[in-house]
């Protein structure tokens, strides 16, 4: 009987600690973060159009395209495809993405397409692409929008995020497309 009360006390203590105190502490700390821990929003005319850390689907020719998503950009079902690079289904899917990309960019050769433009990220929601992935789309976007390639290329170069310490440079696709809509 003594053991049962000890176990119940420990269980109650752990529930209070991890279900009440810890979440409240994290919530309190988040209040000091930008946007109070509610995510880094991107707004246009005071209307939230997306989040900086969650990718969105862009497949219109007048916008820059992001990375493909294994979960069709469903944030609730975030995840990769879990298929090996040697899986025939995966290879067929990547080939289909390459074919689609080449149809929209007939001036490119297959080997010029950066891997991030035809492979999904581990989360399936990556908001960023490589600068190379953005730069190879400049011609298509400029032609469709009837803008000079130089102007669109300058916009891309302005939106390249350099790594803080280590890593690679990236371009946030939503931020780039919002800035693109602001171009005249």
UniProtKB/Swiss-Prot annotation:
Keywords: ATP-binding, Cell inner membrane, Cell membrane, Ion transport, Membrane, Nucleotide-binding, Potassium, Potassium transport, Transmembrane, Transmembrane helix, Transport
Subcellular location: Cell inner membrane
Predominant cellular place of this UniProt entry's protein: membrane
Top-level taxonomic group: Bacteria
Membrane topology: Single-pass membrane protein
Family listed: Belongs to the KdpC family.
Record's function text: Part of the high-affinity ATP-driven potassium transport (or Kdp) system, which catalyzes the hydrolysis of ATP coupled with the electrogenic transport of potassium into the cytoplasm. This subunit acts as a catalytic chaperone that increases the ATP-binding affinity of the ATP-hydrolyzing subunit KdpB by the formation of a transient KdpB/KdpC/ATP ternary complex.
Subunit text: The system is composed of three essential subunits: KdpA, KdpB and KdpC.
Protein name (database record): Potassium-transporting ATPase KdpC subunit
């Amino acid at each position: 009987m003594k053991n049962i009360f000890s176990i119940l006390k420990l269980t109650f203590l752990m529930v209070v600690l991890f279900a009440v105190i810890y979440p409240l502490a994290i919530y309190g700390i988040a209040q000091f973060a930008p946007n109070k821990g509610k995510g880094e929003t991107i707004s246009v005319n005071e209307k939230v159009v997306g989040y900086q850390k969650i990718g969105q689907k862009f497949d219109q020719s007048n916008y820059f395209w992001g990375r493909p998503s294994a979960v069709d950009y469903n944030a609730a079902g975030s995840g990769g495809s879990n298929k090996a690079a040697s899986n025939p289904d995966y290879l067929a899917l990547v080939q289909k993405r390459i074919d689609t990309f080449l149809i929209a960019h007939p001036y490119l050769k297959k080997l010029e397409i950066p891997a991030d433009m035809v492979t999904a990220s581990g989360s399936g929601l990556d908001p960023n692409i490589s600068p190379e992935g953005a730069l190879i789309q400049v011609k298509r976007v400029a032609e469709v929008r009837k803008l000079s390639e130089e102007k669109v290329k300058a916009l891309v170069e302005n939106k390249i995020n350099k790594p803080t310490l280590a890593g690679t440079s990236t371009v946030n696709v939503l931020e780039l497309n919002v800035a693109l809509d602001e171009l005249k």
